[in-house]
Curated annotation (Swiss-Prot):
Its main location: membrane. It comes from Cyanothece sp. (strain PCC 7425 / ATCC 29141). This is Dihydroorotate dehydrogenase (quinone). One of its GO terms (cellular component) is plasma membrane. GO terms for biological process: 'de novo' pyrimidine nucleobase biosynthetic process; 'de novo' UMP biosynthetic process. The keyword Protease does not apply. GO terms for molecular function: dihydroorotate dehydrogenase (quinone) activity. Belongs to the dihydroorotate dehydrogenase family. Type 2 subfamily. InterPro entries: Aldolase_TIM, DHO_dehydrogenase, Dihydroorotate_DH_2, Dihydroorotate_DH_cat, Dihydroorotate_DH_CS.
Length: 375
């Protein structure tokens, strides 16, 4: 247990009983301030100190994928930095890539608060944020300004969602609008059709609704950016198989498995202090440790169905190097974290990388790319 887990995390989670969203926003404001002034000595020094503390050079874990170089396979999942305000900072925390968003074409406030809950006894979270963000145009401006200040050090993904005000039958144009505004600023793009917190969004995972989205975005993709689809862990296997076929048909770059779940497995948490309700009564997506097994099962299914030929970003319940390795062995090419990072603290990425190095050494492998994972 590190200093963050033994002192700071309990203070924030229990002593203050703070609204998790308030804490997150305060941290993002600090990150935004550092990022905005990163071309000046004080902020530049802070970034250097963060990198010295939390980064770990791991050339044996680097990956070449989609024409991009990932310094290591551990990335920040979408949802934390929705508006990209700290996009240039995440590499200093040791991440090998980062994903901003989810962003929508129209700015939107999201769902009413409280909408983010921590379940420490389960190492989990529930959120029903509802894609709160400043909009695609604002994100494009933010990323353009960041690019002028300093060169990007890690690949940046942009996660696109459908605006709540946009009818489902107009979803294609909504996604296209965001993609056109942001195409120049992302190294890869993710289409989110699997969040449980936008009414009707998950219905876009059906073949009839999904195919026009995949086709239109690939046709618009003149710069040939890698396009990925983020899927739900709650899909039936036959529905997932249909999605895999469509992704292959339209030559998309890969899948992100998985989003949060609407399932409520048996949890230790009985009452959420902010609302006085049980987790079963709270709407929203469940993330963290309870999602680990299901997300890994989905990763393994995709890997088997595609013969290991379709890249997968694995996300869901990663807290330790063993968790990350399990997903890699199931078929994940890259790994994302979010809830685990909140619980484990900023030193988590370094711990994961150290553990992954050990896994390679124990198997006598020189690099992660040499790993043989039979479908």
């Amino acid at each position: 247990m590190n200093v963050y887990q033994s002192l700071l995390q309990p203070f924030v989670f229990q002593t203050l009983r703070a609204d998790p969203e308030t804490v997150k926003l305060q941290l993002l404001r600090l990150g935004e301030s550092i990022e905005r002034h990163s071309d000046r000595p004080p902020a530049r020094w802070i970034k250097q100190q963060l990198a010295q503390t939390f980064s770990l050079p791991t050339p044996e874990l680097s990956q070449q994928l989609w024409g991009l170089t990932f310094p290591n396979p551990i990335g920040l999942a979408a949802g934390l930095d929705k508006d990209g305000v700290a996009a240039g900072l995440w590499g200093s925390f040791g991440f090998g890539f980062a994903e901003v968003g989810t962003v929508t074409y129209h700015p939107q406030p999201g769902n009413p608060r409280p909408r983010l809950f921590r379940l420490p006894a389960d190492r989990a979270g529930i959120n029903r944020m509802g894609f709160n963000n400043r909009g695609a145009a604002a994100l494009a401006q933010t990323l353009e300004q960041a690019q002028k200040r300093s060169a990007r050090t890690i690949p940046l993904g942009i996660n696109l969602g459908k605006s709540k005000v946009t009818p489902l039958e107009e979803a294609v144009e909504d996604y296209l609008g965001s993609f056109r505004l942001l195409q120049a600023w992302g190294d890869y793009f993710v289409i989110n059709v699997s969040s449980p917190n936008t009414p009707g969004l998950r219905s876009l995972q059906t073949a009839a609704n999904l195919e026009p989205i995949l086709s239109a975005l690939q046709n618009e993709n003149q710069a040939r950016r890698p396009l990925l689809l983020k899927i739900s862990p709650d899909l039936a296997w036959e529905d997932l198989a249909t999605i895999i076929d469509l992704v292959k048909t339209y030559q998309w770059a890969g899948l992100i498995a998985t989003n949060t779940t609407i399932a409520r497995p048996e949890l230790q948490t009985k009452v959420i202090p902010q609302t006085g309700k049980s987790p079963q009564e709270e709407a929203g997506g469940l993330s963290g440790a309870p999602l680990k097994q299901r997300s890994t099962e989905v990763i393994r299914f995709i890997h088997q169905q595609t013969g290991g030929q379709l890249p997968i970003i694995g996300v869901g319940g990663v807290f330790t190097a063993a968790d990350a390795w399990e997903k890699i062995m199931a078929g994940a090419t890259l790994i994302q974290v979010y809830t685990g990072w909140i619980y484990e603290g900023p030193g988590m990425v370094k711990q994961l990388l150290t553990g992954l190095q050990t896994e390679l050494q124990q198997r006598g492998l020189d690099c992660l790319a040499a790993l043989d994972r039979q479908p």
